[in-house]
Amino acid sequence: MVQPHDHKSASPQDTVTSVSIQLLLFVDDRPSSQENIEQIQEHLERLKSEYPYDLQVIEIQQQPHLVEYFRLVATPALVKIVPEPRQTLAGSNIVDQLNKWWPRWQCAIKEAQDAQKVHNETNNQGDGDSPLNSVGYSAELIRLSDELFRLKKEKEELAEQIKFKDQVLAMLAHDLRSPLTAASIAVETLELANNQPDSPRIVQLKEQLYQQTRKQFRIMNRLITDILQASKSINAQLQLQHTHLYLQPLCLEILKQMGDQFQEKSLKIEKDIPQDLPPVYADEELIRQVIVNLLDNAIKYTPEEGTITVSILHRTTQKVQVSICDTGPGIPEEKQDRIFEGHFRLKRDEGKEGYGLGLSLCRKIIRAHYGQIWVDSTINQGSCFHFTLPVFR
């Protein structure tokens, strides 16, 4: 990697003793850039004999805030910060551009030196250090400005998180009340039924009450799970544990585990999952979470005796596509993009448990795997959710 020239240390505390041409050379670590960078530095070294200057070489990986501040779009790039106005040279012909602009910069710096001399004589000052003209000082000022902007942004994000959590707690308290009340009534009725002599009617009533109680507890569990998942996605970046993952056994395992939920609504499950699928490069637990969430939604919106289809396609050598389809009410076309937003709910969801936070988390997980997730849906015909994952190589 190219190191800073001896003309100027990279320390922000360094200052220069007079007004001089001051340059920032932005470089990267690409091998293809090294020859161009060396040519620029060699040419600057030759120019030094004509006129002194101060140069700081900046590696963009170490100081990205400077890249953003100077709005650089390519490297290498040479930025002249003194004399003003600031000027950026970029592209493959920086040496030619230097030859064009160097005489003009010399004239401008001589004018600045004359003005500085008059100012010093007027104010009875010597040629002391001029930190305002220091490359290091300018870089430090930019860094502090960038840090202030970052802290303001973090403050705004934290305020949004606190606001969201307050909203979620209020929603949770409100939505938990209904299933909790229903479960309490069912338990109290069971207590009364246990004091009655057994009869076919009492046995049937108990079974119905048990089912009702289990259903209400599942609703409460779903509400709490939604909140926990959303909290994780907001408070921390996803920690992916990539491995070569075989989707066929994972999908079959999940379908088996959710069998009781399918049977409860007499749903028909259709599978099109080839055995010769290549492994994907993914985090098993996070992908399991995505599949379970999409199947949960399919169960919730598919009417009794409806059909849910799970299929996996390997259309290219680079990715695998998973699709989960239902025969539910469908999603309006104008709403299909918004359902992946964290707090968006369709009108059909107003009577459903959950907050619709699951699809937002699914999108975050799939994007973290460099995949895509989307929905195809037709009103009154059903919806198909698709996502892709990269093939393991």
Curated annotation (Swiss-Prot):
Disulfide bonds: none annotated. Coiled coil: none annotated. The keyword ATP-binding applies. Gene3D superfamilies: 1.10.287.130, Glutaredoxin (3.40.30.10), Histidine kinase-like ATPase, C-terminal domain (3.30.565.10). Its EC number is 2.7.13.3. Homooligomerizes. Interacts with KaiC. Participates in the KaiABC clock complex, whose core is composed of a KaiC homohexamer, 6 KaiB and up to 6 KaiA dimers. SasA and KaiB(fs) compete to bind to KaiC. The N-terminus interacts with KaiC, while the C-terminal histidine kinase domain autophosphorylates and is probably responsible for self-oligomerization. The N-terminal domain stimulates the C-terminus to autophosphorylate. PANTHER family: SENSOR HISTIDINE KINASE RCSC (PTHR43711:SF26), TWO-COMPONENT HISTIDINE KINASE (PTHR43711). This is Adaptive-response sensory kinase SasA. It comes from Gloeothece citriformis (strain PCC 7424) (Cyanothece sp. (strain PCC 7424)). The gene is sasA.
